[in-house]
């Protein structure tokens, strides 16, 4: 049994009692990376020398019994800036970018005395559902190396599933925490929009992006969200909501819980094995005293189209800053200022990023704004209202995290429409801004299936309670890939 088979709480107790040291944990992390990284490719940049130094310092100082995360190794998605540690967003255009400040979540993790093992691979600028659009390399699913880990936080999920780190941070714009968590058999939380500061997150779509934790189990996830939540003056969209002790909500008692199951989430396009795993999970929750009814989120069908217009429009604006002038890659082949802009961007961005910038620029252009962007915003309002209406009568909404299990590497990369439509069960949650968690709920043909539990605004505590109660009745989260 390795050290990472223990939970956050168990490792904390061992550290306080000096049965193990932070140096032991960091060493275990790098030993595991050495053993499996060539197979999975979770990381872009490792932080070995610094991590070992921090671990020694923490060990010498002793672990504060009140600091649950002190001395524990974490991986951070490479679109979250880290001072003096290369941050690339998995793009050639930021290949050598060395930030001069930490993202707010990174500062909070440093205050919590976690130890950053390195920066995790992702789809370029978080645009993708498979971690195949990274400029550096593809990441492989630890459960089946011929398959994708999901995306865009594929490295964050694969590193946890492969035991390279204890937990990680990802970001979720349209499912980028929940879908990889489902594909890799781990737990991923997308918090309510505004719960976690976005300061220092390299922007994709600012009205949709949210940082969240990926962990082996629900309790660890709750501890990590406690550490990174809270109002931040540097982020005007962060909300002044008290930081709850989410870990206190893990009581196991869900008697009387009212669950809504959208008929749109278990209909056409959902793999039979995925559907069966979700229905079995609902039976487990019924045994625990919950009840469920079929409900409708009638505007879900507009989710993917609305999302790709709105997210691409915001991306076309956000990514205009990468022009070869201030930072990042600069084309050596330019002779005029206009050439500098065009060549830097055409050489520095990958195909998927360029596709979305062009789509967004088109949607915002004169004559098309009303037909596309404005209509997508109107559809977004209707999608949000669907959730508001269901939550009047139900406590949570439940469905699959993804309509399929992990697909083959190169299986969809040349078919963007099919890839986009695979996000159908996650993008409505981002459009509405509500929280959702993915927890392992079974297997289909040997591949993990994720159960998505969706809550009302700022009801992460309830999501943790339900997810934890389910987890305690099952063993799916204890299953490990055979690497």
Curated annotation (Swiss-Prot):
Catalysis: reaction(s): L-glutamyl-tRNA(Gln) + L-glutamine + ATP + H2O = L-glutaminyl-tRNA(Gln) + L-glutamate + ADP + phosphate + H(+)
Entries under Gene3D superfamilies matching the protein: Amidase signature (AS) domain
GO BP, one annotated term: translation
Designated name of the protein: Glutamyl-tRNA(Gln) amidotransferase subunit A
Membrane-spanning ranges: none
Keyword Transferase: no
Keywords: ATP-binding, Ligase, Nucleotide-binding, Protein biosynthesis
Superkingdom as given in the UniProt entry: Bacteria
GO CC list: glutamyl-tRNA(Gln) amidotransferase complex
The protein's assembly and partners: Heterotrimer of A, B and C subunits.
Pfam families assigned to the protein according to its UniProt record, in alphabetical order: Amidase (PF01425)
Family: Belongs to the amidase family. GatA subfamily.
Keyword Chloroplast applies: no
Organism: Listeria innocua serovar 6a (strain ATCC BAA-680 / CLIP 11262)
Active site: 77, 152, 176
Enzyme Commission code: 6.3.5.7
